[in-house]
Amino acid sequence: MQRANHTRPVLIIGAGLSGLAIGRLLTNNGIANIVFEASPPERSQGFAISLHDWGYSLLLEALGGLSLRAMTKAVAPDRFIGGTGWVDLIMRDNTTGKVLVEPDVDARPAVIRANRNSLRAWMADCGDDELDVRYGHRLKSISGSVGNVQAVFENGAEYRGSIVIAADGVHSAVRSQVLPHIVPEVLPVVVYHGEFQVSHDEYDRCVRPVIGTANILAGVGDGFNTPITVCNITKTQVHLDWSYSRPARGENDPLFSTKTPEDQTRDLPQALLEELASRQLAEPWAKYINPETIQQHSVFRWISRCVYMPTADALHAAQAGVVFIGDAWHAMPIFGGEGGNHALVDSVELAAAMVKEANVERAVAVYYEGAARRCQEAVRRSRSRFYVLHRPMAEWRDIAEKRRAKAALEQKH
């Protein structure tokens, strides 16, 4: 059993949400660490994600008992106009705009939206000591064992540390070296994502009447979804994104591919344009998600992937001085998945174990005892949840009718 070597820092690979979160938590607790990131510092992930109370509450507590308001003031997409990232969780029929499903007020989950760029910056700043983040460091190899690991980077830099924390996402370079047999599984789903901006006046005129003060306008159709979400609002501009998603229609679906796309789709597939033209969308979806308008947007084809790691494999990697957090060991599809939330919980739980346990090997074992089942079950749920969110319209209307009948019955009593 190896004792922690406090003269050697913890080496964190990846400066995404989980990497920055655990870097900040370790730094705040006096545990030396270095965060390495392959990308340049100006890389952008400007879209927003949903944070659930079971994720952000643990993070806020671990950061010293910060208030939710302290976070939303820094990360909410609508923070510049006094918003708090509120989400109404309403599902609307995207062909009529009418409400299909609305959560009960008493049972509404606590969910907020956060701009990813802002969330990363906020976490990095949540402490007295600056984080040591080294960009332009793409991992080449790792070697050694727990207590004494070496990381070599493509730029020639070499570092020794007590342990490597793999926070490098679904395509984890660390995982591909120590557990090469665990590879991402591509789910048979179609997802196109577009980013655009409008003036504040246009937003108030065209989107606000339907979305209100919420940050997501969830539109569901007959087996497909068209959410429009707020990424960032300023006094003059509103940055928005839309998604068009549905299950793949067999192997010959012209919109489904397992090939990794370029960063941005330059030439939109004719099949996508024709499919969108056939959807009789209501406003405001029709205004922004149509064959003509989307050609002026930045459009991306997203591949939905899952990563599932058995506990035995995770513990085997630990013997080589590697511990996993975030998408590197539990990637989930962006629709129906809660990967970002589990990544934050991973960071909190691993940091807590490392602070409490002087023995590195024991700290990792304690972390996996709590995290493995949580994450494995979340990956399993995420596979089916995509299809639940993309059900036929007849099922959505049946759910809506049953809820109305239940509400009417409760009012009588």
Curated annotation (Swiss-Prot):
Residues 1-23 form the signal peptide. It comes from the Eukaryota. SUPFAM superfamilies: FAD/NAD(P)-binding domain. Pathway: Secondary metabolite biosynthesis; terpenoid biosynthesis. FAD binds at residues 37, 48, 120, 327, 340. Glycans are attached at residues 5, 94, 232. Its cofactor is FAD. Keywords: FAD, Flavoprotein, Glycoprotein, Monooxygenase, Oxidoreductase, Signal. GO terms for biological process: terpenoid biosynthetic process; viridicatumtoxin biosynthetic process. It holds the Pfam family FAD_binding_3. It is an enzyme of class 1 (oxidoreductase). The keyword Methyltransferase does not apply. Viridicatumtoxin and its derivative, viridicatumtoxin B, exhibit anti-methicillin-resistant Staphylococcus aureus (anti-MRSA) activity. Moreover, viridicatumtoxin and a C2 acetyl analog, spirohexaline, have been demonstrated to inhibit bacterial undecaprenyl diphosphate synthase, a potential new target for antibiotic development. Gene3D superfamilies: FAD/NAD(P)-binding domain. Belongs to the paxM FAD-dependent monooxygenase family. This is FAD-dependent monooxygenase vrtH.
